[in-house]
């Protein structure tokens, strides 16, 4: 049963209270997007398989391994109609794109980089697992098992770093742009794979209840998690209250990224309509299931005592409660942290806010130097295997293949007391050395 959306009616969802207005989309309307999807990418992917068949095609028909689909897309864009349609869509710049505003959105990230990264991990990713329909797709890929989850998180972080590293990176042919297109084609491949398995064994994936895998609504929800919920929910919980200009600039960045990734983005034309969509999506989609709990806890387990901060499970849980609120964190079955770890989480937020407070006062040359160091540090953290990175970059190929009978299970990481103590000391060293690096 849908809630009463009469304008002026109060709604409350996991600690967030708001009034329904005429700007809010009707739930029955946004739920129609459960059954629509990015057909441009699907059609282009089918043609790429014909023009450049994979050399190592699996028996299950999952043809994406060892191919850079972005390079192939560009190569065949002028000679194939379906591929050309997708290429033209991502390279023809819409009238609403303002590169100066997008650059300001990137610089907003630089100012609050530590806070934004924590919000992305604990709200966009971990908290986003409360979306009960989305996790049905994620559970079937196996990419959020505890032993492989960290790589999945690093790939997501790499994409984000490439998106914000420079304006040229997010423009057509740039590194962040290319990664966004690769992720779009990855989504098309996962969707196709799951639908083939459903056809092979009816009941494997319930499209009536969950919608098409990686549908338009869930694409919207993903962009909401990375942008709107971050500025309206997550950052304020860390004590960062964005100005109207900062909000508009950051949303402009993600409107463009979402567009490149094949997401409907008209609802992002103003911060007010974006906030209204966020609230409607929260009411419609955030209902944590048992699979939500499994994946959320696997994310925590994968990050426990891992570089760069080597944080304990209790400290990570405290961050999860701080950034998602008591209700959602409890619904995700995250163990409740004690007052000590909650205090540490609050102290970390205060230190990050103190570090960010002087950014706007710095001369532009100093800001540019700090920004450059920040991007270098981030790339090193993600790609340097010696400190827990990926050992290089990635082309976002399909590594976690949906299979009949494969579902993500709850995992755990065992670590001794002395390892925890050592990791705690190393984590403190990494945190403070990183702060010193950025400010010298």
List the model feature ranges, each with a label.
Residues 1-224, 229-440:
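Mature, function-bearing regions of proteins
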